[in-house]
Amino acid sequence: HFSMNHFFRRQGATVLASEVCRASIHKKMNAQVWVDNLRGRNPELGRDIDTPQELIPHIGIEKHATFTPGGERMELIYMGHGHSPGDLVIYLPERKLLYAGDLVFSGMHGRCKTCDFGGILPILDRLMDFPCDTVVPGHGSPVVGVGTEGIAIYRDYLVTLQERIAELVTSGVSMEDAKTKFDDWKYFNWGRPQLVHTAIEHAYKDFVWRSRFEHFQALHEDKD
């Protein structure tokens, strides 16, 4: 998806992304200022980049594409907005292997700044229907030999996170205080502990925004 640590194309390969992701990169990165910004933030990565066009994927996939590299079927499927607006998964049916990307984290916390907490759960439910033995997450170790168990665990992570956030917000607990209310959460000690409060913050903001939006909708429906 669109993130500084997720794309480059100077290695000679044809780069594919969902069309939503490709268009986002094209819109935001097709300016020299982004190249200059990248060089300033990470000189080692940015030193070999000459033009913004080098950052844009070659091909955008609208919904679904099938490739057969080496004679093996590989399906690229756009899932919608879960972790980010451009979520794309790769499925190898013959191996029962699913590359889930950042739709799934395994045993570690992650940044959920662009996550649609309402949209990602139905997407995870769809992924649970994929016949697979191994799931490769966006972050964390592959979940091997247990089918979609890794997806189910991350789904529970998100559900329990949102349930507690809902309780805290409804009780009037501030976002900063909410970060102190998760020490007994069963996923609190996952890897990358420096990001647990980031995940809580993003979930808190998402819940508040959705609550306000639903309230706004209800007011307009009453007027109609």
Language-model features and meaning:
Residues 20-79, 85, 94, 124, ...:
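Metallo-beta-lactamase
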Residues 20, 102-103, 139-141:
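Active-site metal-binding loops of divalent metal-dependent hydrolases
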Residues 73-131:
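Active-site-proximal loop/helix segments of hydrolase catalytic cores
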Residues 14-20:
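Short internal beta-strands
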Residues 170-224:
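C-terminal regulatory/interaction regions
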Residues 1-11, 86-89:
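Di-metal (Zn2+ and/or Mg2+/Mn2+) metal-binding site signature of metallo-dependent hydrolases
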Residues 1, 83, 139:
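Histidine-centered divalent metal-coordination motifs
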Residues 97, 119-173, 177, 181:
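Divalent-metal (often Zn2+) His-rich catalytic cores of metallo-beta-lactamase-fold enzymes
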